[in-house]
Amino acid sequence: MKARRTVAAALSVLALTAVAACGKDGSPNTDTAKSGSAAPQLPTYQVNADAKLDGSPVWTEAKKNGKLRIGAKSDQPFLGFEDVQTGKRNGFDIEIAKMIAADLGFSADQIEFKTINSSARETSLSGGQVDYYVGTYSINDNRKKTIDFAGPYYIAGQSLLVNKDNSEITGPESTKGKSVCTVTGSTSVTNIKTYGANVTEFESYSLCVEKLLTKEVDAVTTDDAILKGYAAKNQGKLKVVGNTFSQEKYGVGLKKGDAVLQQAITDALKKHEQNGDWKKAYDATLGLSGADAPSIPDLTEKAAG
């Protein structure tokens, strides 16, 4: 919990730097961010040309097509963001997706990122629209009824985003009767309802933030790292309040029953955590504030049986 609070607090420093490092649409401009000699650099990933996953139908089909389809978010600064002008993706989750892809034998130009809303993640995996999903995807037992996970690769905590002049909401206990916005299908919905909040749901966090800025809702709730990205993007207008009130373990989602692919993704995560790529990816995205990287969680998700 201490590590998560430290990361969340330190990310507020981005409010001083993110605006200068953002493009016209508010997306993090990694070229600008890395212009200084001491700026952290994104890692590079060597493609495993000898990768072979016998027994994985998902990998076999992807290899046959020469393309890996990865589900991701597109509206989360410093996590999963798509520049609407260039189509380029950046953020910590995007780097996690790329390092896994390299170990599976796919180069960056063989990746097709697909924006999948939270409410459609399970169906997109089960239906084969994407090969795996990386996008602040919390591991829970209900989701594991229909899909599998590898990981976790990161641990976050739920918090609240409010307007800068809001002094009434200081934490989840003060949301009773208040209008709180979050994303359809996210674990945040269930968590905040226990405090008596009136929940409004949209398909993306950016829509929730728009409603917050126009004061059509009183707060936005989701994981602290996501909220700090939006606070930085909207410098001087929004703030994150209170301590985290949940533990969210981010995992890589994949089609249920593909144990070979699940193990391969687990092995890739372990490798890149141990060789320093995970830390480099964090430092060049969420860690741009200078905050120390949080502890890397144990990889607990394994194939059944």
Task: List each model region and its residues.
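Bacterial lipoprotein signal-peptidase II cleavage site
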Residues: 18-33
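Extended ligand-binding regions for polar small-molecule ligands
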Residues: 23, 35-53, 252-290
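Extracytoplasmic small-molecule ligand-binding "clamshell" domains
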Residues: 31-132
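Short loop->beta-strand "edge-of-pocket" segments that line small-molecule binding or catalytic clefts
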Residues: 68-72, 90, 172-185
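Acidic, polar ligand-binding/catalytic clefts
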Residues: 109-174
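Short helix-initiation/N-cap motifs at beta->coil->alpha
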Residues: 111-123, 167, 184-186, 200-210, ...
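A ligand-binding cleft/hinge motif common to bilobed small-molecule-binding domains
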Residues: 137-145, 194, 218-247
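Periplasmic-binding protein-like
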Residues: 155-162, 228-269, 290-305
